[in-house]
C-alpha cells in the first residue's frame, strides 16, 4: 500500500499535517494526524526513508519530521533553519536537502547532513548554505552565518550579500540528479543540475502570449520526468510540463474560485493522482483520479 500526506495551513498553532493510508488495492483504510500544534504548514517533502518533512510558512518557521504511520511524535529539525519555509526535496546521493523560501526576495537553500542516524539524515546539526547564481547560471553555495536567527537578528535571506533572490519560492522536487522548483512571483519553473552546479529556467509564463500555466505552486515529478504543477490562482488546474517544455492541462477544479490546488502526488504504481483543493467550498477537499495517464513516480 501507500500513504498520502497533506498539510494544514492554519495559523496560531492550529496547523499540522495528516495522512491517508491505502492498501495494496488502492482502497482507503485509515486517516489520522501526524503533526499538530504548528503554524501555517504550507508544503513539505517526503524522505527516502518514508517520513514527511512539514514546513511552517512563517517568518521564522521551522521544519518537522513526521512519522507517516502516526505512531511517533514529530521531531523538530533545527538544522534546516528558521525562515519562511515552503517545501523541501531530498537528494539521497549526496546527503542533501534543498529548500525553498516563500518571500518576494527569498532564497534557495541546501542542507548537507554531516551525520547519519540509522540510515537517516541527522537534521539537528549539519551545514546550511544559500545559493549564489552567477550571470551564466552557475551556482555557488555559501554557508549561512546564523541558520537559526532570533526575531531581533538578521533573517537568513539577508545574511549573505552574494545570495541570489527568488520571487516567491514554492514547490520543489528531486528527480534523476536534478532539482526542480517553482517561483510564483514570476511564474517560472527552474531546473538545477546538481552535478554541473547549473541553474536554468525551463518554463517562463511571461515569454508566452497565452500561457497555459500561471499561478505556479506545488509540484511533483513523475518517474518519466514530467513535471506536474498545481496552480494557486490561474485556472485552478494541474498542468503537466513535458521534457520539451510544452504545458498541457491535466485536471481543473471549477466552482471553487477562492481555493488553490495543492499537494499533487502520484501513487507508486503510477495509476492514481492525488491532490487537494485547499479551501474547497469552505473546507479542504482531497481528490483521487485513477488512470494510466503517467508512468508513475514518487
Listing of model-derived features with the role each one plays in the protein:
Residues 1-298:
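Sequence/structural signature of beta-propeller domains
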